Amino acid sequence: MTSAPAAERPAAPAVPRIKWTVVEAVELFEQPFMDLLFRAQQVHRAHFDPNAVQRSTLLSIKTGGCSEDCGYCSQSTRHNTGLDREQLLKVAEVVEHAKAAKAKGASRFCMGAAWRGPKDKDMETVLAMVREVKALGLETCVTLGMLKGDQALQLKEAGLDYYNHNLDTAPEFYGQVITTHTLADRLDTLEQVRGAGINVCSGGIVGMGEGRRSRAGLLVQLANMASPPESVPINNLVPVPGTPLENVDKIDPFEFVRTIAAARIMMPTSFVRLSAGRQQMSDELQALCFMAGANSIFYGDRLLTTDNPDTDRDEALFARLGLRPV
């Protein structure tokens, strides 16, 4: 397996691996808030520059028409969200988006497709996208659903740096959100990605109605992998009208920060990414998340079908906080 790019390598030596239990993770969540943030910041400073944030840009290369029933997703054909199905983008169009992302300061370009998994007929186009984006000097990432056969090896040969496939939530809550594929299916794809020598990007979504134990359980699943993900995106649910989760109660903001802090402590050398939901966060809440150990964001005004802060707002926030790009 190839080593992670310099931007993703921790500055400090690797720490001994800890196998977490759900009980231990819950106890971590239950620490006094200030104690938890202090511990998370200590861990963060031991492995990363505390004032540096990695920036990724995410583009939907194929929108809508997905056969799966993920309860949070606007792109499922099983939900009445009013989203039209679109065809796979042309390679040249993707390259133009990637050039714009690089010009604005992104170091990684992520490409997402709404389907259960890529069909063979679409793979050559996706592989060409990876090769062309890589040639721009950007790190490449794709999120294509479940892989089969030698697709992971094909992506590796094309130059793919990262593959995103989130676990979404804890095992005991998973069936309340998704029924068309299992958590085991997701883990199988991640094993294929690891086996091909591609860096793993995997995290989850909070605020879907799960309890603290399930949030802790998600992090345990991630932290206890043979090799924890190099990138761990933590999404704060953005309820979409027409989906089963459109009326779910919002997670308490401090509980979201606790989740970030626990992720940092449990996966000390992983990049922890603030993902979906930043548009709804105040600058102050985001600052707390950075204090808790988040050191990566999605950069740009769109995340697949969800709004994201525009780059001007992010640049203003980074200036106020003294944060700089990786």
From Swiss-Prot:
UniProt remark on cofactor binding: Binds 1 [4Fe-4S] cluster. The cluster is coordinated with 3 cysteines and an exchangeable S-adenosyl-L-methionine. Binds 1 [2Fe-2S] cluster. The cluster is coordinated with 3 cysteines and 1 arginine.
Enzyme Commission no: 2.8.1.6
InterPro entries cross-referenced by the UniProt entry: Aldolase_TIM (IPR013785), BATS_dom (IPR010722), Biotin_synth/BioAB (IPR002684), Biotin_synthase (IPR024177), Elp3/MiaA/NifB-like_rSAM (IPR006638), rSAM (IPR007197)
PROSITE patterns per record: RADICAL_SAM (PS51918)
Cofactor(s) listed: [4Fe-4S] cluster; [2Fe-2S] cluster
Span of domain Radical SAM core: 51-275
Residues bound to [2Fe-2S] cluster: C110, C141, C201, R273
One Pfam family from the record: Radical_SAM
Similarity comment text for this entry: Belongs to the radical SAM superfamily. Biotin synthase family.
HAMAP family named among the record's database cross-references: BioB
Name listed for the protein in its UniProt record: Biotin synthase
Organism field: Aromatoleum aromaticum (strain DSM 19018 / LMG 30748 / EbN1)
Gene that this polypeptide is encoded by: bioB
